[in-house]
Amino acid sequence: MMVSLFSQFDSPWLLNIPLVLLALIMPWKLFVSFGPSWAGTRSSRLVYVTMETLMSQVMQPLNKLGFRWVVLFSSLMLMLMTLNVIGLFPYTFTPTTQLSMNLGLAVPLWFGTVVYGFRNHPVIALAHLCPEGAPNLLVPVLVVVETLSILMRPLALGLRLTANLTAGHLLMHLISSAVLGLMELSVMLSGITLLLLVFLTMLEIAVALIQGYVFAILVTLYLDENL
């Protein structure tokens, strides 16, 4: 039971061939051909307004020096939101439920902010390891605690995204199995459970969008400490 339950998080294979290879050999699908017809559509306007609103909130903590990162953060947030939502469709694979991918995004971004801080403002970066006004006897302990706290940031960033999406997928899988099982016992109970599944799906769509936003804004806050 547990094997079949968690098998939905395995990378899909077809005829003993990993389908991820198919994605890797089709990079041109990632590029969009912008033209006059695309620029004037309502959907493009909706995407533009939505991204403008979200990025204004994400970049709000940063000063002018941080605006050079706006393309990276907007691309990161849009990619995570897209992958999270697409993973809710049937017969799809959600790569953001894999801790390896999330850590692969979190560690380089976090490490880049740390290196940027130590390279441009080494004194300020070191000052973050010891809170202002701390007693002299507690300084060594506080330095160790703050160092561990900073080192745990990418792990917490990746685990947060993985845990939230994995829990939602498992809950949807369990409730959908309950819907099929209750059809033989009571149509009414099955219908009520199906209604619950619909509301849960709507909630998971919101969670998928929010988690992409949270990931991007946390990286922004890490960068703000090192600017």
Swiss-Prot record:
CDD domains according to UniProt: ATP-synt_Fo_a_6 (cd00310)
- Coiled-coil annotation reads none
Question: Gene3D superfamilies from the xrefs?
Answer: ATP synthase, F0 complex, subunit A
Compartments it resides in? Mitochondrion inner membrane
Q: Which GO terms describe its cellular component?
A: mitochondrial inner membrane; proton-transporting ATP synthase complex
Q: Name one GO molecular function term.
A: proton-transporting ATP synthase activity, rotational mechanism
General function of this protein = Mitochondrial membrane ATP synthase (F(1)F(0) ATP synthase or Complex V) produces ATP from ADP in the presence of a proton gradient across the membrane which is generated by electron transport complexes of the respiratory chain. F-type ATPases consist of two structural domains, F(1) - containing the extramembraneous catalytic core and F(0) - containing the membrane proton channel, linked together by a central stalk and a peripheral stalk. During catalysis, ATP synthesis in the catalytic domain of F(1) is coupled via a rotary mechanism of the central stalk subunits to proton translocation.
Question: Which family is this sequence assigned to?
Answer: Belongs to the ATPase A chain family.
Instruction: Supply the name of the protein.
Output: ATP synthase subunit a
